Structures are given as structure tokens and as C-alpha cells.
């Protein structure tokens, strides 16, 4: 996968599962469905998306969780070519 494809994979998976705002997903669950040789790139790309504020972090007692930023959902939909 190319970096852009990994970003699209993460955003699409989270959008498809409606992981927006208060609903969140762990890094381990995000990695499922991705080829094993690309799983290291998922974490690096996820950190990049957090810095771009497309994804927000939710610290929990059982680890860091991630969700799509509801304030930037229109931009995310443009990236995914939805609508």
C-alpha cells in the first residue's frame, strides 16, 4: 500500500463503521483487514492523521482510542470521494 492508500484505508474503515466523535476504536482493531507487512505503517499514518486533526485521540484506562473528528467530517468525505 502507498501512504495515501493507507490514509484512505484508515479513514474509510472508520467512516464505514461510524467511528465518529464519541465512538472510538483501538489501534489493534484498526489494523485488522490490513496485510501483515503493512501493519507498522498503520501506526505511523494514524499519527500523521492525528496531527492533521482528521482523527482525534481518546485516552482510556485500557489504552489510546481513536475516532474521526466530527468537525472535519465534510473534509474527510471529500478525501474519500463520498457525495
Segments and roles (model prediction):
Residues 1-20, 80-83:
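Short alpha-helical segments that sit at the start of domains
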Residues 16, 20, 33-36, 55:
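General structural signal for alpha-helix termini and helix-helix connectors
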